[in-house]
Amino acid sequence: MKAALAGKSSTVASAQADWNARIRAVSPASVDAPFVSNHDMARARGMLRSKVPNEKAAALLYLLMPGVPTVYYGEELGMSGSGSDENKRLPMVWSSDAATQCKAPAAADQAQRLTDGVAEQDSDPDSLLNWYRQLIALRNLAPELTRGEMTALDGGNDAICAYTVTDAGSTVAIISNVSQKDTLTVSLDVLRGAELLGGIGGAAFADGTANLPPLSGMIVRLP
């Protein structure tokens, strides 16, 4: 989340690759379960300063990581909650109509600040909910991401997170730009001859070069 806030993600890949290697050294069959929030910690929205672009940047990074990313309910909407455990477990916001929500835990001392629920965000193509949907669909194009071995790449810019993931002889590269203002290009020898599987945020790929608008990413399969 620090990388998402700062718009600097170049060290994320190397740190995650090192972590995955440490896991496999202990248990070769294990897979990581990346997350940014769960029921025992303050919700990601508060830590990301309640700004949707920051939330999108964090999701862009962790939902394309190797392993089995875990989304805590309501995170994909931007639900808030911190302090006592009950505040972190407030009812799902299905719509702006309070009648659609369950009762809050009895000991909760915070009210849910989010007003736009599933119903409202569902019809907004730029909503956080639809961003999560697009990222999950993108991830599903690369089965290598579940159990593959991760290797960090140097994307040439602090805002670029780049790495490869290899499983069963097949390798994909993930390249993401967490800058919220700069369009960046990435040209690496390893990308020559690669095939674009899919992208998000207007990312484009041609002749071994990734063109990445602010908050965008892609997956390519290497030859």
PLM segments and residue spans:
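Beta-strand-rich binding/interaction modules
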Residues: 182-201
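Loop/helix patches that line or flank the sugar-binding groove of alpha-linked glycan CAZymes
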Residues: 14-18, 29, 43-172, 178-183
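Short, conserved catalytic or adaptor-binding loops enriched in Gly and charged residues
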Residues: 23-27, 153-154, 189
